[in-house]
């Protein structure tokens, strides 16, 4: 059974539509002296785009299958995942309840009200604030219990949509990448931001099957490699099992020098990467995920950290709405 056939065993809503573009960044390539390509998952078609829509194709389908009328999820005030979950809920006629934290402890009104947070109000989300998402699975379970007691039928969408079911979205993306690359380019490396780990794990499983010679690198955005590796590996293993795969799993490669000072706080390298892509390619990165991941890619070239000098693919997971919340830092 092919990978595509295995995917068809899982209920899926078609939210993404046609394959997102895979483009060469010609001006950046000339600037760096290295072929750089980009997978434009920032332009998925719901609520200003982003990678979570791929996960929600499977998660929301499962919610509908279970008869849910409410999506319950969690994230930071400027969470791209919560924004996309809320939009999908609106599109499907579901309620959405979001448990939010303020991970950087700021009182700046722009951060607290603009960007992704502004969009949650437009999508009519029921927002619940908490001090910190220290045990998000337990906190979401407790919130779902309260929502159910109010007469709703909740479905819990994990932080980032990151579990084995959601990660199927990035197995699907791997199929797109392989089809778009076939006969055109042979990637030596693929770079992606690694946070809640579902996107990274889905690519790890999919690309192992489809582009086994490509080195997949996750640039961490919230924790050290030692802390992040088990998160990726757990979803990778569960995902492979759900797809009936028995081969040894691909090694998880993580670069963790680019997320300081902490999750959700911009740094100089990330902001420099945002400005570089905007000025050379007219493409918008964000200060939490893709800016830091691109900073890793740029430094990786400078420090010769890649396995060879072949073409590099950058997975653009979205996040540009957060730019407005981080002004004037960006």
Swiss-Prot record:
Gene Ontology MF term list: D-cysteine desulfhydrase activity
Biological process according to GO: D-amino acid metabolic process
Keyword Lyase: yes
Alphabetically ordered keywords of this record: Lyase, Pyridoxal phosphate
EC number per UniProt: 4.4.1.15
UniProt cofactor(s): pyridoxal 5'-phosphate
Matches recorded under HAMAP family: D_Cys_desulfhydr (MF_01045)
Protein's recorded name: D-cysteine desulfhydrase
The species this protein was found in: Yersinia pestis
